[in-house]
């Protein structure tokens, strides 16, 4: 249905706000499932004048537990979501090695994924995802980078400026990763 997107930037740069807006643009006839950790920031259910939901949205939250058998983490929710035939999956933020690879693999299986990650630039976003995944998985850098480029063809980099405003600074399309070089097309650069 769509193209997977990773929105990157530092804390306070507007990643979640932009992601929420993008997800709000998903047509009402498409099934949207969000996964968030800790607290719910997305409210994407649209209602008619009588208060009835007019779109198909499911919001899910992780639930940590001291008992590992009762822990409901992002990875477990993502595994379950894939069986629910989503048109679009919104994953609040990639923070761990496990999440970085499992979210990427979901995108590579034909699901449209929108997610966020902390990084310093559009280009460094792919390397950030790769190094996050590398913490747990012993895979060659080249393979991990190719996975990330395939999983997220589009990277949007956001930044909070000195005056406090938040802006999209760059949008790139990752094309490939060969011989240690990210091959990408800069779609917008401010």
Segments from the language model and where they lie:
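Hydrophobic positions on the alpha1 helix immediately C-terminal to the Walker A/P-loop
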Residues: 18
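Switch/coupling sub-region of P-loop NTPases
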Residues: 2-11, 21-149, 159-160
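Conserved small/polar residues in nucleotide/adenosyl-binding loops
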Residues: 188-190
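Conserved lysine of the Walker
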Residues: 15
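Phosphate-binding/switch region of NTP-binding enzymes
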Residues: 144-179
């Amino acid at each position: 249905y769509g193209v997977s997107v990773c929105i990157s930037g530092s804390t306070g740069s507007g990643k979640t706000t932009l992601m929420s807006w993008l997800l709000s643009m998903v047509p009402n006839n498409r099934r949207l499932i969000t996964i968030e950790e800790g607290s719910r920031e997305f409210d994407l259910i649209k209602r008619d004048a009588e208060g009835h939901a007019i779109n198909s949205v499911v919001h899910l939250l992780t639930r940590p537990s001291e008992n590992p058998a009762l822990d409901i983490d992002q990875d477990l929710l993502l595994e379950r979501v894939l069986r629910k035939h989503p048109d679009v999956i919104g994953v609040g933020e990639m923070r761990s090695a496990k999440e970085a690879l499992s979210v990427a693999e979901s995108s590579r299986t034909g699901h449209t994924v929108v997610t966020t990650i902390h990084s310093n630039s559009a280009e460094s976003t792919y390397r950030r995802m790769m190094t996050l995944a590398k913490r747990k998985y012993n895979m060659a850098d080249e393979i991990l980078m190719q996975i990330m480029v395939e999983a997220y063809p589009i990277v949007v980099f956001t930044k909070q400026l000195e005056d406090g405003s938040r802006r999209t600074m760059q949008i790139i399309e990752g094309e490939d990763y060969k011989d240690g070089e990210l091959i990408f097309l800069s779609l917008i650069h401010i």
